[in-house]
Amino acid sequence: MKLTLSWLRDHLDTTALLTEIADALTDLGLEVEDIHDPAARLHAFTLAQVTHAEQHPDADRLRVCRVMTDEGEKQIVCGAPNARAGITVVLAKPGDYVPGIDTTLGVGKIRGVESHGMMASERELELSDEHNGIIELPSGEVGQRFTDWLAANAPEKIDPMIHIKITPNRPDALGVRGIARDLAARGLGTLKPLEIAPVEGGFDSPIGVTIAPDAAERAPHFTGRLIRGVTNGPSPDWLQSRLRAIGLRPISTLVDITNLFTFDLNRPLHVFDAARVHGDLTVRGAAAGESLLALDGKTYDLRAGDLVIADANGPESLAGIMGGEASGVTGATTDVFLESAYWQPIGIAATGRALKINSDARYRFERGVDPAFTRDGLERATRMILDLCGGEASRVVEAGAAPDTSRAYRLDPARTQSLVGMDIPEAQQRATLEALGFVMDGDMAQVPSWRPDVQGEADLIEEIARIASLSRLQGKPLPRPRAGVPLPVLTPLQRREGAARRMAAALGYNECVTYSFIDEASAALFGGGSDAVRIENPISSEMSHLRPDLLPGLLAAAARNQARGFADLALFELGPVFSGGEPGEQTVQLTGLLVGASAPRDAFGSRRPVDVYDAKADAEAILSTIGAPARAQVDRKLDGWWHPGRAGNIALGPNRLATFGEVHPRVLKAMDVKGPAFAFTVHVANVPLPKVKTPTRPALNLSDLQAVERDFAFVVDAGVEALTIVNAAQGADKALIESVRVFDQFAGDKAEAQMGAGKKSVAITARLQPRDKTLTDKDIEAVAAKIVDKVAKATGGTLRS
């Protein structure tokens, strides 16, 4: 955002110096990136008078001039065609730096004639592009500083330009008035009133406006009017100078007025040549195959649904982004239709990004302009057009209505002081909000329509702190810890998160940090995308919702890596996910993703594709690290983004500790990931903390007696899970059975041919560890019988013969 000091003073009655304004802006959060002060580079130049000029003896286009300066008469060789006796000029002496030619002058000889300095043109002093001759001043004293003469006679020539970096959450600061409002609230002046004098139309507009049903949500409000009999010549010097100062090229009065409003009041407008509009204007979605030759000279092929303003012949403008050349105004325009509308930000951002169009209008509409200023902006622009171009205005035509953005939040002065850490009196807090445009009703603050970023009590406090200046905060040392055993710095949950992160890295995963914001389509794939987690002022449409899961970010990272030739991936992320916008609807997860092979190619053939068991083993390893009990069960109550037959939950009763398995192929296709892909999610906070804190671990109690292992093979239904068999066998004798593990499975057509349709064989090893006495064969057989009985009752299976 660029503006000049004089432009700022059109809205702010202030005597503050440029440096004071720049410092205040940065302190307010409106970072000043650069200040271009022409006077700083012109300070050395003085006025002089040419007393005599004659032809150079050895050059047709050069003249030898005698110039009266504050140091006496000097000889200067000049090539300007207007160098002559009697004119007052701007003198650059030897030793002066001339910015336009990037040169420090010295005494030199030009074609054998000595020259002491130069008489400058406007381009050489970077005042304009004029270089056909040296500067001729109508008045001035010899020796007077050129900057003093400019300040008195042409102040716009040395008007400082301020370049400010505006953050996405402050669309109101994309207009000079919004910046002036912040400075006034800080106390650097008084905000001047903005006069809105409605123009009474003298006739009905022959061009009507409508909003098609398919565009109503994206285009809630459209206003316009016809102005006939205008003269569209060059704009006044003050307007041209203002636009040039911020890097814009003056075009014509009508176009320059719309550009002025864009930067002055953050109100983009558009003007149509009424003679080139056929019928009424309709805001609608583009049809497939339509195109538009825009004002930048490029033809854009529109997507179906892109928001356009169309007449009977087709699209005439890309709504909120850029007008069309066919209906653009020219020097011959006499009747103009002026448009002022409010467009929904996300739709503008999506269209602009898809068509790769950047414009000042798009930049503002996609961040959010003031919806309540749509009609007032039209009236104020109409008044300026009538003043500068003449003509007669019609009555306003209007479709839709400005969206209701009214909202109010309670101001708690005590909470403000608590959060900010500064003593800010209640009266000052209220005065600050009122200066920023908030309306106070008791302790409720009504948010102004131009501040879409204010969405809660915390934002009120932020505004108060910003205006009061956080630079006033006094540093306070932290209290010294008391003697003795120090208290833990991290909470139990934070320590658990750290342990989970370290274990994931130890398992070979690479940590990713992805955005917490994702697009609506990706959020919907993972059970999100509701209005409760929609971002009010997203940076882009690809960051419109809070993420419901960590998998979207990891899958997007996998897709980017695959596109760059990295096929074998092991990625993980630990971070928050959001199921809603209320307290308690934010949880912490650790999610890992495996794609490709388990290892690089080697001479031993150890490389194999990753599978669901890798994901399960890694999930169990992390759960074990953070203290999950070993008695967890596996169930199949899965979310829709998991493969229904190749995934499961690790749960403790109804409490889900982790999910592992293959990601659904439908999700992989939508995320452009080459599968299969396997993943796990550990719900870190769901793992119960130990009920009793023990300062030390119990001593390891090893038995001196010989352990015994026995193998069992059970014939069970194909749908029986191995964990069911393991848990049943484990419970046969908890005192003696130390562990049970699966070592073989026989399933498929061959298994069914031997054991019957729908059957499979699962083989387990049970390890028996006596504590009191050596086991006899009778003892072992008794335990084996219990194992067979328990498994039979749990699964309906039989011991395989």
How would you describe each model-predicted region?
Residues L5, D23, L28, R63, ...:
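Glycine/proline-enriched, intrinsically flexible loops and inter-domain linkers
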Residues M1-F203, F337, K356, D360, ...:
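Phosphate-backbone binding interfaces of nucleic-acid-interacting proteins
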Residues L183, G187-D214, C389-T416, D423, ...:
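Terminal amphipathic helices with adjacent charged low-complexity linkers/tails
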Residues G178, Y409-F572, R767-Q769, T774-L775, ...:
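Extended, well-folded interaction surfaces typified by the phenylalanyl-tRNA synthetase beta subunit core
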Residues L47-Q75, Q240-S241, T258-A326:
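Conserved mixed alpha/beta core segments that line enzyme active sites in large multi-domain catalysts
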Residues K2, E20, D27, A435-G437, ...:
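A carboxyl-terminal module marker
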